[in-house]
Amino acid sequence: MSLHLKPGQLTLADLRQAYLAPVRLSLDPSADAPVAASVACVENIIAEGRTAYGINTGFGLLASTRISPADLEKLQRSIVLSHAAGVGEALDDAMVRLVMLLKVNSLARGFSGIRRKVIDALIALINAEVYPHIPLKGSVGASGDLAPLAHMSLVLIGESRARHRGEWLPAAEALAVAGLEPLTLAAKEGLALLNGTQVSTAYALRGLFEAEDLFAAATVCGGLSVEAMLGSRAPFDARIHAARGQRGQIDVAAAYRDLLTASSEVARSHEKCDKVQDPYSLRCQPQVMGACLTQMRQAAEVLEIEANAVSDNPLVFAAEGDVISGGNFHAEPVAMAADNLALALAEIGSLSERRISLMMDMHMSQLPPFLVANGGVNSGFMIAQVTAAALASDNKALAHPASVDSLPTSANQEDHVSMAPNAGKRLWAMAENVRGILAVEWLGACQGLDFREGLKSSPKLEQARRLLRDKVPYYQEDRFFAPDIEAASQLLASGCLNALLPARLLPSL
């Protein structure tokens, strides 16, 4: 993928593509003037002997310590070295690429006082697929993501290591792959690299992208379950949802109507049945999934804004010659957006688990117990449903909001923090749980449909059915179940059901 970056104009679709695959990045010339002006402003402050935080002072509680001109370069190198204190497993290439892209986008807006040479070095690393070692843990999301961004920056100054095509290389070798040599950071540049919400935002963006894929899958699986359970189409009638007026609900109901078309043989087979109302997990899908969609859309809006934000501190306002300390590094918007995504993921999984449970109950489903013939000898989906219940329960605990937590840091100078990285990365575990739940529902709904006398569903739902059956055959009798769940999960992880939903239903798709 080629991406020509106009600073401050990244879209969610751009970010999704950059997360999914390597990117060839170029920077629009419109960045040149503001970047150069901000550097000149910093140089003027030093030349005039003015005191400005982060340029010629210490950091955090040490902000009142004035640094001599002779030590300014050492100050910037020292902050990178000392702040690289993260722990845990290394972020994968996709996450590091996303972090670096977000950092380039922020720096290139020209409020950070950092030379184009440093920005170009980050771009060169991205284009050469050289990804610095960044540990997963160590940031509280204020003052920015200091530790992980320090690890990113180490490679630029010739320290630490980076991964290139799966191989870890010492920094000097990694820089050479990208045609670079170690940089000497000028005044303000180390702090500009370290300060910002780019890691928190990248964590939450990954959560958003996975949540979107799972939302699409849950909608399709929910439609398959309606068919397998001989559910009514009446609850998806547009008039019901227009009467309430909730946009997410209206859009989701339309998506279900698109899936559950009148051409379905399954639907025609029970047109004149005397069933009045279906259980809520079938009937209220537009209401529940619509509320989830609304939360996801709101979170996506916040994250797209943050992806284009300047979250450095202090900020350089070159036109006025001012350098002003503020708090844009505080990732509270990101933390709250991630918390809302967590609620949506928990509900998507919870609703799916309830549909699975319905299909297991022969009195509710009019299907063989646990979706298998010769019950007793065969146990069928009995324990697969238990697995789904375990995963749904796990997500209820993980959904607790991270943004309500705070611990003071830096000797109480940084006395309220966002915990946005925790809010974001827990979404990955939640998404994995939801994927497992939906894998069981997909398997179960297709098995249920196989019992419906060879009747076909709608074209789109039949496509979803074929996708699964190409990997997992019908259950004639009990067999080793876990590989089938894994096969379905891997299919879901590919986003293979996204195309079955209407275009632009989800923010980045």
Swiss-Prot record:
Report if keyword ATP-binding is assigned: no
Where, per UniProt, does this protein localize?
A: Cytoplasm
Query: 5-imidazolinone (Ala-Gly) crosslink - at what positions?
Result: A142-G144
Q: Which reaction does it catalyse?
A: L-histidine = trans-urocanate + NH4(+)
What the entry lists under Pfam families is as follows: Lyase_aromatic (PF00221)
NCBIfam families xref list: hutH, PRK09367.1
**Which top-level enzyme class is recorded in the Swiss-Prot or TrEMBL entry?**
lyase
**Any idea what this protein is called?**
Histidine ammonia-lyase
One Gene Ontology CC term in the entry = cytoplasm
Residues where 2,3-didehydroalanine (Ser) occurs?
S143
Which source organism?
Pseudomonas aeruginosa (strain UCBPP-PA14)
